[in-house]
Amino acid sequence: MSKLGISSLFKTILLTAALAVSFTASAFTEGTDYMVLEKPIPNADKTLIKVFSYACPFCYKYDKAVTGPVSEKVKDIVAFTPFHLETKGEYGKQASEVFAVLINKDKAAGISLFDANSQFKKAKFAYYAAYHDKKERWSDGKDPAAFIKTGLDAAGMSQADFEAALKEPAVQETLEKWKASYDVAKIQGVPAYVVNGKYLIYTKSIKSIDAMADLIRELASK
C-alpha cells in the first residue's frame, strides 16, 4: 500500500474512532437521563447513593430487582451508599437510627450490604415486608418501640446493644450525612440515585439494568 493510501486509511480509522466516542458521549443526555444537583451532596466522590424510605413502595421494588444487580456491575468504580430519608413515614426517624446502626455494624464486620448476612439488609427487608406486604403500621406513629423491635429482631440485635451503638460517633456522623436526603428527595421523590454526589439519575428514564449501569459509569467518569 502506498504512503498516501496508508495515510488515508489512518485518517479513516481516526475519524471512525472519533465518531464512536461522540456517539458514546451522546448516549445519555442531561435533562433527560440525569440532572446536575444545584446543591451537591458533600464528600460523596466515587459513590452511588440511593436515597430511600422504608415507606416507599418503589424503593422496595427497586431493592428487590434493581439496586443489587446495578451496584454489582459498577462496584469497581463507585461504592453503593444508602441514605435513608427521615422525613417520610410515621417512623422515618426511628428507621434512620436503626439503619445507621446496622450499616455501621456491617461495615465494621466487613460484610457487604447486599450479603445475606447483612444486618442492614435483614432489617430493611423486614420493614419493607411488614409495611408493604402485611400493611403493618405499628399504631400509626404511636408505638415507636414496636417499630424498632421489628428491625432489631430481624437483624438479631438487642435493644440494649442498639441504644449503645446509637451513641457511637460513626453512627451519629452517618445520621448527619443523611440530612442531605431531603433536598434530593424533593426533586423527584424516592428512590433517588445520585452519582458522585452531583448527578441525579431520572428513574423514569431507566430502561434496563445494563443501561443504568452504563449511565452510572459515564457520570462517574465526569
Curated annotation (Swiss-Prot):
Induction conditions: Expressed from a tri-cistronic operon that encodes AssT, DsbI and DsbL.
Major localisation: periplasm
Domain of life: Bacteria
InterPro entries: DSBA-like_thioredoxin_dom, DsbA/DsbL, DsbL, Thiol_disulfide_DsbA, Thioredoxin-like_sf, Thioredoxin_domain
Domain named Thioredoxin: residues: 28-221
Disulfide bridges in this chain: 56-59
Localisation per UniProt entry: Periplasm
Keyword annotations of the record: Disulfide bond, Periplasm, Redox-active center, Signal
Gene Ontology MF annotations: protein-disulfide reductase activity
Signal peptide (from-to): 1-27
Assigned GO CC terms: periplasmic space
Matches recorded under Pfam families: DSBA (PF01323)
Impact after mutating residue 56 to S: Loss of activity
Keyword set includes Repressor: no
Gene3D superfamilies: Glutaredoxin
Function: Involved in disulfide-bond formation. Acts by transferring its disulfide bond to other proteins. Part of a redox system composed of DsbI and DsbL that mediates formation of an essential disulfide bond in AssT.
Similarity remark: Belongs to the thioredoxin family. DsbL subfamily.
Quaternary assembly: Interacts with DsbI.
Annotated HAMAP family: DsbL
Name by which UniProt lists this protein: Thiol:disulfide interchange protein DsbL
Gene (name only): dsbL
